[in-house]
Amino acid sequence: MKSVPSAGGIVIKSFSSQRSAITPAGPARFPINLFPERAARGFPENAMPPSRWAAFAAEAAVPEQLVPYVRAVSDLEPLECGGFLAWRNGPALVLVGHDAGLKQGGAEQERSRPEAARLDAAVGEASSLRGIESLTVLAPFRPDAAPEWAVSTRPDAYWGIPLPTDAADMAYGQKLRNQLRRARRDILIAREGWKPDHAELVEQYIRSRPFAPGTRHLFRHIGPYVEAVPDALLFAARDCEGALQGFAVGDYTALGTVFHLFAFRAPESPPGTADALLDALAAEGIRRGHTLLNLGLGINPGIVFFKRKWNATILRPHVETSWAVQRPQEAGLLGSLKKLFGM
């Protein structure tokens, strides 16, 4: 079973692991301010009204800001901390520290911007919420407000391509043109609703690799997500006999950016299937007036190669930083001495 490099989508890691971020954990729920009894159980009371969900989704720079998407595939509660979107699962909170001001340039350039100080303030607010025990920040850099015991991932970056006003003006290299031409002889691309053979293709991929439970949950909720979110579109590639050769899902909720979230293809799909699916996804974005196609994180050299084939460039750096709100206890003599002398 093979899979096309996808846009990365939601960050999938278990809240029980050392590197925790957004973890799908069941069907979407209503905002917590509709359930006053949750506050008595320790939930914060600064939940967002639906109008703020729409504002974040309209200006989304990363998938975790697509509120309909996250709510369709998870049980996370949307909050707002210091003007940034955050997601809560019990004692764990994920702060999405990407916004319009925190994008182009390297990490050091980002740190010099006023928005960096705003992110640090949001980290402080998130850390002080009642019942929060662990915090993960998704941002272009490691926040200065992160404590010394915080753990950061290897720096990555979101990649993307600008979309012209006319699909005929897409900038393809000759090799990509040839692949698209070849694929179009063997497959037909069309928009479809979620079907059993889409689910089976996903299950084949899940069975082929030892995915974490959160990853399997996310993949198995692609169908409910496509069915629940009007601007989540599925493009399917089928051969002349109607057999499914692959599919891709794009999210068009944001006003200016299309997000390439998922892509799967059959093991023996014709060459260029992945490219033909992405081309259809981009063409729909152009038709709708979008100006940017977000291809997700680099992840590994193979996925970066796929993006570069499409003349993609880095949109913004990305680092995940996670920590326990309370300093972990140090065992042994050193920990005892530090406690004794107030260190």
Where in the sequence are the language-model features?
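A short, internal acetyl-CoA/4′-phosphopantetheine-binding micro-motif in the GNAT/acyltransferase core
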Residues: 98-114, 164-166, 262-271
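Short, basic, low-complexity termini and linkers enriched in Ser/Thr/Gly/Pro
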Residues: 15-23
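Active-site/acyl-donor-binding loops of N-acyltransferases
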Residues: 23-60, 76, 81-85, 148-169, ...
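Aromatic (often tryptophan-rich) hydrophobic motifs at membrane interfaces
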Residues: 231-332
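Intrinsically disordered, low-complexity segments enriched in small polar residues
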Residues: 3-9, 14-16
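Alpha-helical elements of Rossmann-like donor-binding domains used by nucleotide-donor carbohydrate transfer enzymes
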Residues: 121-125, 200-204, 276, 280
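A conserved beta-strand-loop-helix scaffold within acyl/acetyltransferase catalytic domains
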Residues: 26-89, 172-269
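Acyl-donor-binding surface of acyltransferase catalytic domains
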Residues: 28, 112-188, 192
